[in-house]
Amino acid sequence: MYSRREFGRLALVGLPMTVALAQGAARVNSKVNGVRIGIQSYSFRSLSLDEAIKAMAGIGIGECELFSGHVEPRVGPPGGAPGARPQQGGAEMTPEMREAMREARRKQQEETRKWRLSVPLEHFKDVRKKFAAAGIRLQAYNLSFNDNFTDDEIDRGFQMAKALGVKLITASSTLSAAKRVAPFAEKYKITVAMHGHSNLTDPNQFAKPESFSAALAMSKYFAVNLDIGHFFAAGFDPIAYIEANHARITNLHIKDRKKENGPNTPWGQGDTPIKQVLQLLKQKSYKIPANIEYEYQGEDAVAEVGKCFQYIKDSLA
């Protein structure tokens, strides 16, 4: 579901999008002073795929890292699409509530697995056509391989990426899952970029530079999808990391967080060096897409993403 403000804003951008879909659209150019700017479609998690595409075109963003929740069926509550990230906040849960949630999640995972293994690949080709008609380049498919994936499910994920016409999968994965994914990346010759968060206590998670290094050593088809907000909140310097590893960074997630594992914030209110990272991309001419990822809580996703894009423009002026 989406808010009234989002609905109103989509109505404004919907007419030109309708015309574009009917006539074909010129490629949307969202480069800012030579820096490639895209979006993680998770930013529009409250919108359907068609609504998200309309929003991207209306804002003027021409590259998309496609969140799997936008193409897979929503078998859970709003915001709980397959592959969705857990939401923060809420009342303390009882043990019974936690067990009920675990059972619901198990059922959801099984339903999603059945769908992944049976859905015609034409579904993904149709998604590809929608982006092409809107003039938006599909940059990557965000499918987070985890330890619950079967081998058939992993293989199918690469088939989905091929049907979408992308050569990159981004994944919030684990080191143990990455070992199983590596042979499939080699088989399909599709790059898998590991996305990190800020969990420093679990060595199986991607958070520390050492975790990324371990994955990079597994396959030449493994790379890094660096989330500068999470990386900084975990206590690491994204600028130094990008300079040292830019050759194996496929794309960035741009967001603002407070230091010392602090919360997501509206851009400019946290501690993440967003402007400095963008300036680095510009000055070094790194061809690394900087993808907006709107993750803090706001009332209107479309308006907030527009603010994020303007922040980028101002930072690169």
How would you name each of these model-derived features?
Residues 43, 67-68, 142, 196:
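Residue-level recognition of beta-strand->loop/alpha-helix junctions
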Residues 40-41, 115-116, 145-146, 169-170, ...:
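A generic structural signal for short
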Residues 12, 16-17, 29-31, 51, ...:
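Active-site acidic/histidine proton-transfer and metal-coordination neighborhood
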Residues 102-122:
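A short acidic, glycine-rich active-site loop
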Residues 57-72, 185-190, 194:
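Conserved long hydrophobic alpha-helices within structured protein cores
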Residues 62, 69-74, 84-88, 118-128, ...:
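Active-site anion-binding loops
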Residues 64-66, 138-141, 170-171, 289-292:
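Short beta-strand segments at enzyme active-site cores
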Residues 2-38, 45-62, 71-100, 206-209, ...:
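Histidine-acidic metal/acid-base catalytic patches
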